[in-house]
Amino acid sequence: MANSIALAEKFVPVIDGIYKKASLTAILDAQTQVSFDGTNTVKVMKVETTGLGDYSRENGYANGNATLSWEPFTLTEDRSAELSVDRMDDEETLGQAFGMIMSEFMRVNVAPEVDAYRFAKYASTADISSAAAALTDGAAVVSALRACASAMDEAEVPAEDRVLFITPTLYGLVEDLDTTKSKEVLKRFSAVVEVPQTRFYTGITLNSGASAWGYTKAADAENINFLAVSKSAVLQATKMALPKIFTPDENQTKDAWKFQYRLYHDAFAFENKVTGIYLHKAV
């Protein structure tokens, strides 16, 4: 009988690889992850200081203040699914059915949902810069991107970690412009990532699985044209991305391979770095 622990260890790197390849927001992941071990809430330190004042030869230094506070982040999204493949279906496909289903599940269901959730979370953050317009040609897109880049420049958001997420349709309008000069604005972002509209909304509804699965666009949501995000402005946290695999011999309910997947995660924007997010939505 195949060992289910060994199978899980074998498939975890494969699942992670499929997710990272399919995920569009993985580019925003921090190199060092915040640890949620033993808790569902972490606190991140925020520092605020006063600026310079005049030095007095009589009284010395201008008295300023340094304030330390803690910003709490609590995980809220606990998602899961259970899939099964009949023993004979897997055997008759030379053992390929089970692996193909896991791959398809991560690529078609998990990665798009996580992306859509993160985009909606950032787009709905209070006090971010935003604009709304119908962008019908390349010139309009370039003008909107210039306004975005200029706003981030004025807010002193580092250009080297700005990522531009934009729909393929709008990116295509920019690419179709005749002159290279018109596309110079794209250089004011460290990376450009094309996002299908199906993942790009200002709000989503996460379905429970009782009558519908995955996610849908929220009733009051708008389509996002593009979203510029500074990597330092957000925190993407995953406490658990755990697959469990049961062989047909271990499965007590039916003669089938069983795959269980649980994803406990969330995404946050730092309160004092909201200038690092710029939303442009459709009207």
Identify the residue ranges that each predicted region occupies.
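Sequence/fold signature of self-assembling virion shell proteins
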Residues: A2-G51, L68-E82, T93, L177-V283
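Intrinsically disordered or highly flexible coil/loop and linker segments, enriched in small
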Residues: L24, G53, D115-F119, P158-D161, ...
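Structured, hydrophobic secondary-structure cores that serve as assembly/anchoring elements
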Residues: T41-K43, T49, A62-N63, S69-L94, ...
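Short amphipathic helix-turn modules centered on a small-residue break
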Residues: Y55-N65
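Short, conserved acidic/polar surface loops in the N-terminal third of protein domains
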Residues: Y55-R57, S84-R87, L94-Q96, R118
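Hydrophobic alpha-helical segments and helix pairs
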Residues: T93-A147
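Extended, solvent-exposed, turn-rich assembly/linker loops in the middle of proteins
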Residues: A126-V193
